[in-house]
């Protein structure tokens, strides 16, 4: 399902970035708008359910989008959201927004580090991780995408590009179990 969403989201993401740059909207504005939309969608389960509801008319969905987002985002970003509604893609809004943010970061030469942690990071821990990742990857700008997952027990995992760093207790236990299992044979 994720691959299909990604396949569907990619053309919309590329088209919106091209449209926003042609309309002289800065990448900073685009990223700020999309990040705000992503946060609101993540925080409001009811909004996500409303936009995914096939029984709700396109007109009603557009009214909801206008009421929530119009005062806070640029006109071009609002137009993009309304076009997605017209095309029947409001249910895929989260994946389209995620893809668009990812493309905007690439265009702005910002590397995204996906961090999964057992407990929330403080701002000092985030800054220290960014600095360490910068030195490891020779990247000038890194944006952290942090997810809290209690099943890690402790520690964290980082994926940046194709590199994965797993310092979690869950990962260490998995590695130990694998090692013990292979040496017993």
Swiss-Prot record:
GO molecular function, one term: proton-transporting ATP synthase activity, rotational mechanism
InterPro entries listed in its UniProt record: ATP_synth_OSCP/delta_N_sf (IPR026015), ATPase_OSCP/d_CS (IPR020781), ATPase_OSCP/dsu (IPR000711)
Membrane topology: Peripheral membrane protein
Source species, domain of life: Eukaryota
Assembly and oligomerization: F-type ATPases have 2 components, F(1) - the catalytic core - and F(0) - the membrane proton channel. F(1) has five subunits: alpha(3), beta(3), gamma(1), delta(1), epsilon(1). CF(0) has four main subunits: a(1), b(1), b'(1) and c(10-14). The alpha and beta chains form an alternating ring which encloses part of the gamma chain. F(1) is attached to F(0) by a central stalk formed by the gamma and epsilon chains, while a peripheral stalk is formed by the delta, b and b' chains.
Similarity section: Belongs to the ATPase delta chain family.
Protein name, entry field: ATP synthase subunit delta, chloroplastic
Gene symbol of the encoding locus: atpD
């Amino acid at each position: 399902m994720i691959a299909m969403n990604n396949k569907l989201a990619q053309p919309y993401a590329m088209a919106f970035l091209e449209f926003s740059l042609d309309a002289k909207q800065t990448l900073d504005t685009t990223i700020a708008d999309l990040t705000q939309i992503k946060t609101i969608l993540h925080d409001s389960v009811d909004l996500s359910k409303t936009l995914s509801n096939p029984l709700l008319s396109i007109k009603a969905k557009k009214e909801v989008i206008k009421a929530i987002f119009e005062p806070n985002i640029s006109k071009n970003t609002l137009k993009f959201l309304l076009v997605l509604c017209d095309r029947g893609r409001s249910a895929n809004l989260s994946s389209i927004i995620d893809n668009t943010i990812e493309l905007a970061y690439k265009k702005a030469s910002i590397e995204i580090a996906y961090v999964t942690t057992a407990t929330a990071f403080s701002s000092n821990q985030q800054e220290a991780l960014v600095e360490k990742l910068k030195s490891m990857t020779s990247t000038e700008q890194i944006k952290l995408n942090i997810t809290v997952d209690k099943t890690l027990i402790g520690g964290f995992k980082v994926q940046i590009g194709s590199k994965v760093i797993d310092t979690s207790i869950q990962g260490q236990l998995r590695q130990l179990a694998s090692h013990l299992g292979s040496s017993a044979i």
